């Protein structure tokens, strides 16, 4: 759209010809008051996924065995600060994003629109190296086998 000197830009409230809108095309939804007279608001689900619960579960798993000599009070638990949790959360998001991007690139090279478990496995081998990749692939394969067990043939 080209504007000539002296011509006004179209705004949200007006049309291009300069006419004013009189009524909205969609009706407004009114909220019904609750018993206390307050309006009930819906909770919006956040778009951000947090892995903090899973990180806490991992911390419980790696707690060292209790030794009577070193620890007189009993169970010793690891804790994590909120900043460290934020770092771990962004780390997990970054790794998932890299794996998804690499796997989608592999599927596009094969001219497929569906991601297969093999694509994810190859992407993990590319992104993670060495022993970490071996453990990640092994854990992934056990999860896939647990989710989708092969049927016994009779």
Curated annotation (Swiss-Prot):
Keywords: Chromosome, DNA-binding, Nucleosome core, Nucleus. GO terms for cellular component: extracellular matrix; nucleosome; nucleus. Residues 1-48 are annotated as: Disordered. It holds the Pfam family Histone. GO terms for molecular function: DNA binding; protein heterodimerization activity; structural constituent of chromatin. GO terms for biological process: response to mercury ion. Residues 1-11 have a biased composition (Basic residues). It comes from the Eukaryota. The keyword Nucleus applies. The nucleosome is a histone octamer containing two molecules each of H2A, H2B, H3 and H4 assembled in one H3-H4 heterotetramer and two H2A-H2B heterodimers. The octamer wraps approximately 147 bp of DNA. Belongs to the histone H2B family. Core component of nucleosome which plays a central role in DNA double strand break (DSB) repair. Nucleosomes wrap and compact DNA into chromatin, limiting DNA accessibility to the cellular machineries which require DNA as a template. Histones thereby play a central role in transcription regulation, DNA repair, DNA replication and chromosomal stability. DNA accessibility is regulated via a complex set of post-translational modifications of histones, also called histone code, and nucleosome remodeling. This is Histone H2B.v3. The lineage of its organism: Eukaryota, Amoebozoa, Evosea, Eumycetozoa, Dictyostelia.
């Amino acid at each position: 759209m080209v504007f000539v000197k002296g011509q006004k830009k179209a705004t949200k409230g007006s049309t291009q010809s300069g006419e004013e809108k009189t009524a909205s095309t969609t009706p407004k939804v009114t909220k019904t008051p609750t018993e206390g007279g307050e309006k009930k608001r819906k909770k919006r689900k956040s778009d951000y996924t947090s892995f903090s619960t899973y990180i806490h579960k991992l911390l419980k798993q790696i707690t060292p065995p209790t030794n009577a000599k070193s620890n007189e009070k009993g169970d010793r638990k690891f804790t994590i600060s909120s900043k460290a949790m934020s770092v771990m959360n962004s780390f997990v998001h970054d790794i998932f994003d890299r794996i998804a991007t690499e796997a989608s690139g592999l599927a596009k090279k094969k001219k497929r629109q569906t991601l297969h478990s093999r694509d994810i496995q190859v992407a993990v081998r590319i992104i993670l190296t060495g022993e970490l990749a071996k453990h990640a692939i092994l854990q992934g394969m056990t999860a896939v086998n647990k989710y989708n067990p092969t049927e016994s043939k009779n």
